[in-house]
């Protein structure tokens, strides 16, 4: 793909995402106002967090939310607290499934999930709108599909990870990730982690900062729109830095990239 094609591609992506987000926000807001006018359910007034599930242990975690803030904390046992009556929980064969049904309330809702710090087989999180905060995400396989909202992950440890960014600030403050496939959306990205194996960072719209732990890296650059700085040196298209065993392919989007 030529630079001209890349420019057209990323401007088209940015404009399309902006239009989708604007139209979706307007529709959701309008529907919420209408529903709120006619539907005065008692559940909409519940703000107190209630514990709805406890367990000694699980193998995997699967979370699917529409418009609820997600907080993941570490604890010795597994438990769930929420003030959202539309949250449903079920466990089967060690897989804990948390799903939100038909929540179009305008009131903010929270979901707090307590899990042990031990490594799970898989963590799968898909969100629509709302913030995400996690003390630790430790899993052999990590899959995040993000919507609109700020994401803050204090620590990530994963053997293989796929992250599809949404709209909003994304941050990993510490980690060890093997074979990361990261597709940024719109918003600033900060990742501080050791990246092992073969990794791909496909940037979107906004500034991306990679604070790599260790020095055993080989960096390959595919430049888009904006500046790419590797150790404060401006990179050009198809340039390679280092000859380490851990490979990181950086595909530029719209905005500055700093490694």
What name fits each language-model region?
Residues 153-156, 160-259:
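Short, surface-exposed interaction patches in beta-rich subdomains
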């Amino acid at each position: 793909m030529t630079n001209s094609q890349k420019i057209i591609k990323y401007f088209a992506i940015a404009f399309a995402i902006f239009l989708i987000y604007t139209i979706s926000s307007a529709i959701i807001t309008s529907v919420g106002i209408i529903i709120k006018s006619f539907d005065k359910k008692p559940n909409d007034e519940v703000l107190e967090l209630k514990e709805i599930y406890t367990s000694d242990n699980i193998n995997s975690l699967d979370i699917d939310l529409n418009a609820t803030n997600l907080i993941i904390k570490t604890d010795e046992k597994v438990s769930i607290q929420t003030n959202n009556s539309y949250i449903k929980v079920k466990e089967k064969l060690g897989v804990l499934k948390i799903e939100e049904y038909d929540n179009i309330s305008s009131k903010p809702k929270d979901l707090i999930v307590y899990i042990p710090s031990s490594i799970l087989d898989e963590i799968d999180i898909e969100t629509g709108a709302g913030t995400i905060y996690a003390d630790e995400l430790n899993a052999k396989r990590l899959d995040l599909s993000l919507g609109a909202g700020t994401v803050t992950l204090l620590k990530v440890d994963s053997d293989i990870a796929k992250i599809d960014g949404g709209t909003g600030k994304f941050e990993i403050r510490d980690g060890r990730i093997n074979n990361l496939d990261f597709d940024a959306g719109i918003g600033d990205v900060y990742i501080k982690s050791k990246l092992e194996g073969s990794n791909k960072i496909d940037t979107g719209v906004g500034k991306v900062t990679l604070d790599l732990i260790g020095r055993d890296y080989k960096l390959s650059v595919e430049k888009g729109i904006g500046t790419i700085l590797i150790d404060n040196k401006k990179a050009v298209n198809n340039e390679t830095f280092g000859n380490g065993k851990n490979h990181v392919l950086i595909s530029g989007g719209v905005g500055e990239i700093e490694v």
